[in-house]
Design a protein with these regions (language model features):
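NTP-dependent nucleotidyl-transfer catalytic core
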Residues: 1-308
Length: 308
């Protein structure tokens, strides 16, 4: 009724922004992890949408009395960082050496190379690298600072130096881009810290001690199907390298056990839907209450420009 409407509007105005505020979550700590874009390049529109969703959800939870921490998980370890380093190294060698044939030869079979743009003058790159302009810019700026100092260095040293230079710049860029639409994080949690602390190895050891792993084809498998997943999952490949799943388990164990949050919320794209069952299976196998993990799936959208 008009009377109710007028009274309610008056209450909203007089509350000074606290209308509807509750203490529903008083004393409960919630960690909301969102965006967590790959730090090897700039954000895409999906990351930006995830930022708006995650930050809004965090604000709603805070308004309901929860103690909320916003967290960005920095994937600064694993295959994508190796790929990042290789991409930077090739571009640096191109800029520093200037001899295309020699640089291509240093990476083996040039049949795997191709042009990244239509320009015939452009340098051919292997398929398994990042080909964006940002890689060229990083390599060029690194060369301006260091000159040809790393041309004769071994490849691993060159890649490490380039990653140590470029990765912090990318992370800083992500932080600044997010701040442009008022998203500020309490924590930037690095995946590499889980490897350095031994937490990744500890997860495999714990699951093995609990009898939840087995060996097949030289790899170590987790009995995920015993805990609601549709299949068992490889933890450690036959070459001894853990799959990405292991640090992910370690990260969620860190959230709920090591740091003791009452609830952990992940904002993920719809392409990660299958991730839910396997992560909850791993937590359950480790003796962690999997209901403490909520995964919010963000649907994909299609952007149209000029009808295309």
């Amino acid at each position: 009724s008009p009377l109710w409407f007028n009274e309610t509007v008056g209450e909203v105005i007089s509350s000074g922004g606290d209308y509807g505020k509750t203490e529903l979550g008083k004393g409960k700590r919630v960690l909301v992890e969102f965006v967590s874009a790959n730090p090897t390049g700039p954000m895409h529109i999906g990351n930006a949408r995830g930022g708006a969703l995650g930050d809004s959800l965090s604000s709603v939870l805070q308004f309901a009395g929860y103690e909320v921490e916003r967290e960005f998980y920095v994937n600064d370890a694993g295959n994508q960082i190796e790929k990042f380093g290789k991409s930077l190294s090739i571009r640096y060698m191109q800029i520093a050496d200037g001899n295309k044939a020699d640089v291509i030869a240093s990476y083996g079979d040039d049949d795997v190379c191709r042009k990244i743009f239509e320009d015939e003058e452009n340098f051919p790159m292997p398929e398994d690298v990042y080909k964006g302009v940002d890689i060229i810019e990083h390599a060029y700026n690194f060369y301006k600072i260091n000159g040809g100092e790393f041309v004769n260095a071994d490849e691993e040293s060159r890649k490490c130096a380039l990653v140590e230079y470029a990765l912090p710049l990318n992370i800083d860029g992500l932080e600044k881009d997010l701040a442009k639409y008022r998203i500020v994080y309490d924590t930037w949690f690095r995946e590499s810290s889980l490897h350095k602390s031994g937490a990744v190895k500890q997860i495999v050891d714990m699951l093995t001690e609990k009898g939840q792993t087995y060996e097949k084809d030289g790899a170590i498998w987790f009995k995920a199907s015993d805990f609601g997943d549709d299949q068992d999952r490889v933890l450690v490949r036959a070459n001894g390298i853990p799959t990405y799943f292991v640090p992910d388990i370690a990260y969620h164990y860190n959230k709920l056990v090591t740091r003791g949050f009452d609830k952990a919320i992940d904002i993920l794209g719809a392409d990660h839907h299958g991730y839910i069952a396997r992560m909850k299976a791993a937590l359950t196998a480790l003796g962690v209450d999997a209901s403490k993990l909520d995964i919010v799936i963000m649907q994909m959208v299609m952007l149209v420009r000029n009808g295309e």
